[in-house]
Amino acid sequence: MRNMKVENIIKEKLSRRHLIKNAGKFAVGAAGLAVAASGGLSMLPSAEAAKKKSSTLPWPYKKFTPAEIKQAGEIAHDNWFKGFCSYATLSGIVEILRKKVGEPYLSFPMEITTFAHGGTSGWGATCGTLIGAGVAATLVAGPKTGEAINNEVINFYANTALPIYVPDHPKAEIKSQNVSNSPLCHLSVGKWMKKEGVGFLTPQQMERCARMASDMAMKTAELLNLWADGKFTPTVKAPVFANEIPSQNNCTDCHGADIPKTSGPFGTGLDLLKGGH
């Protein structure tokens, strides 16, 4: 009988010790369940919402102050020497929105546009600054309005004496501005180099192109601000509507007299050589 009492006392102590030892585990487990039930589970919809938000355009936008527009130019200028024209222009907009808005801009890989340097992989086609500007405008304003904004930026690029932007710390001194009459990298930089009297990949040419990225980033920010205020109104139509073919406004610079003719749905089937070119 005495042995049975001792045995029962030992079992009771062991049971109490086990309970005390595991009490902390039970508490942690209960706390974990409480967190999951309150905050943890609520994170799932938030994550899904963030994912949905990042995959749907347009993205959130907060207007740039005049100081931030200037900063966009500074960022674009500096980043040209890291990733060239398209990346530089895009980064001028996105880097500021990363600070002002956060996601989804924080997760956006700006390097996706580096291929567009030199008129797309060095082929001398559309200047990469315009591709970067178009991506930024589309992220913020959506595809339709983004394209209209980009069309305005292209018109500004082709018909303005550029570059305008002068950095506080230039990599080289340049003296010339030039109206390209074209969105093409080849014509734009080629005409400017001839006027400046320098060659390709000289410090002067690279500085010029960095400033072009600044000008396009700043112009894009200005137009996005107008859009945010409900005041953006397109002022020009893309040449395709006047020329009945995807085109620019100085075909003879490249084609001479051998310009493709067209007959399309936008007009009378004009000869591009006689159609204001």
Residue ranges of predicted features:
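Amphipathic alpha-helical interface segments
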Residues: 92-97, 136-137, 150-225, 232-242, ...
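A short glycine/serine-rich beta->alpha loop
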Residues: 73-83, 115-124, 201-205, 240
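The canonical Cys-X-X-Cys-His
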Residues: 248-258
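N-terminal secretory signal peptides
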Residues: 1-18
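Polybasic, low-complexity association/targeting segments
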Residues: 55-84
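N-terminal twin-arginine translocation
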Residues: 13-18, 30-53
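Flexible linker/context regions in extracytoplasmic redox proteins
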Residues: 48-64, 222-228, 236-238, 256-277
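Small-residue-enriched, tightly packed secondary-structure blocks
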Residues: 84-141
